[in-house]
UniProtKB/Swiss-Prot annotation:
Gene: tig
Gene Ontology MF terms: peptidyl-prolyl cis-trans isomerase activity; protein folding chaperone; ribosome binding
Protein name: Trigger factor
HAMAP family the UniProt entry points to: Trigger_factor_Tig (MF_00303)
Main localization category: cytoplasm
Reactions the enzyme catalyzes: [protein]-peptidylproline (omega=180) = [protein]-peptidylproline (omega=0)
């Protein structure tokens, strides 16, 4: 077998492979034997059909099978022999072939780029340094109290975090618009559910009052006919309610986890906050490292690899929204191409870090990661056992750990500055992605 490789545009390659005639003929004879064993021809018993008749009837199909199989086999032998870093499926083109002669064909394909990492020392990373304060804990406690809150009717003027019951009618240029009217609408204020200016216009008014609110719909508002439009809402304020938070008693505490005292609850909450904070800081640092890697190492990515990643993202999107699997192909590829390209870039760069530094998965760290995940559940031992039984779940954690190890290698060479940051700020940035 002879092999010649041409470099085409970008990452495209074309290989020409020639297979010896005797190898093709030997495979052809074996293929005919297979046909002969199962062929049914009138006048002959199964398996007893003369060779000449078998060849006459099935020779063309047998040769086509042989040539197709040989292209696959010879190509992947060439990939191994030439150490080709194949990306995606090849396109085969057979040359003219005559029985008894050697067989040649071409295969066009893409390869992954050869990546040589550079500029790691130029990557800048800002690492948040956070101390969870008593005030942070108090806020979390208040969140739990609000989940168990009750409401008491008030005759006082409405405040920013009150709950109100209103009737309203909205109009633009004096004309009511669709969806702008409601009766006995309950609004818990302070949650940014309404357009800017709406809740602020209610603050200061008492139950029984009627008044107008002037607002402007945001330019990004979902209804095309209302974007950027000035509107007036006629409001009837029917009821104002103040929030009543439960006292921090043992009875209240027992509603959350295994805590028995307020001190236990605070300790449990702090532990959860520390876990969330660690994950958020790790994710933020990793994102900066990856952004830096991409900025310092512009690499061309194979279109085939991007297309495969697009398909993965399509399927994930359909699954996330509960659609049928066949819907994935209907989603426009351009919706996912930027993310797909980035994922391929990240995969190539981190793989290069791993290979260059001969990194191996830290198995102890895998166990610690699984234990940390399990600690968030009521029965952590059962979660650990579930991972132990599920090879794919464990493999996912191993991949995450290996990526973290790669990020740490880059981080050790990068310019890292620490910045004092609040817990709320870090978590808000995490929520924004």
């Amino acid at each position: 077998m002879s092999i010649s490789i041409e470099t085409l545009e970008g990452l495209q390659r074309r290989v020409t492979i020639t297979v010896a005639a005797d190898k093709i003929e030997a495979a052809y004879k074996e293929q005919l034997k297979g046909y002969a064993k199962n062929a049914r021809v009138d006048g002959f018993r199964k398996g007893k059909v003369p060779h000449a008749i078998i060849e006459q009837r099935f020779g063309l199909a047998a040769r086509q099978d042989v040539l197709s199989d040989e292209m696959q086999r010879a190509f992947f032998d060439a990939v191994i022999a030439e150490k080709i870093n194949l990306a995606g499926r090849p396109t085969f083109t057979p040359n003219n072939y005559q029985p008894g002669q050697e067989f040649s064909f071409t295969a066009t394909f893409e390869v992954f780029p050869e990546v040589e990492l550079k500029g790691l020392e130029n990557i800048e990373v800002e690492k948040p340094v956070v101390e969870i304060t008593e005030a942070d804990l108090d806020k979390m406690i208040d969140v739990l109290r609000k989940q168990q809150a009750t409401w008491a009717e008030s005759q006082a003027a409405a405040q920013a975090e009150d709950r109100v019951v209103i009737d309203f009618v909205g109009s633009v240029d004096g004309e009511e618009f669709e969806g702008g009217k409601a009766t006995d609408f309950t609004l818990a204020m302070g949650q940014d559910r309404m357009i800017p200016g709406f809740e602020e216009g209610i603050v200061g008014h008492k139950a029984g009052e009627q008044f107008d609110i002037d607002v402007t719909f945001p330019e990004e508002y979902h209804a095309e006919n209302l974007k950027g439009k000035a509107a007036k809402f006629a409001i009837t304020l029917k009821k104002v309610e103040n929030i009543v938070l439960p006292e921090l008693t043992e009875e209240f505490v027992k509603k959350f986890g295994s805590a028995k005292t307020v001190e236990d609850l605070r300790a449990e909450i702090k532990k959860n906050m520390q876990r969330e904070l660690k994950n958020a800081v790790t994710a933020r640092v990793k994102n900066q490292v990856i952004n830096g890697l991409i900025a310092q190492n512009e690499i061309e990515v194979p279109a085939a690899a991007v297309a495969e990643e697009v398909d993965v993202l399509r399927r994930q999107a359909v699954q996330r929204f509960g659609g049928k699997p066949e819907m994935a192909a209907q989603l426009p590829a351009e919706l996912f191409e930027a993310d797909a390209k980035r994922r391929v870039q990240v995969g190539l760069l981190l793989s290069t870090v791993i290979g260059t530094n001969e990194l191996k998965v830290d198995e102890k760290r895998v166990e610690e990661t699984i234990a940390e995940i399990a600690s968030a559940y009521e029965q952590p031992a059962e979660v650990v056992a579930h991972y132990a039984k599920n090879r794919q779940l464990t493999e996912n954690i191993r991949n995450v750990v290996l990526e973290e190890q790669a990020v740490e290698v880059v981080l050790a060479k990068a310019k890292v500055t620490e910045k004092a940051t609040s817990f709320d700020e870090v978590m808000a940035q995490q929520a924004q992605g």
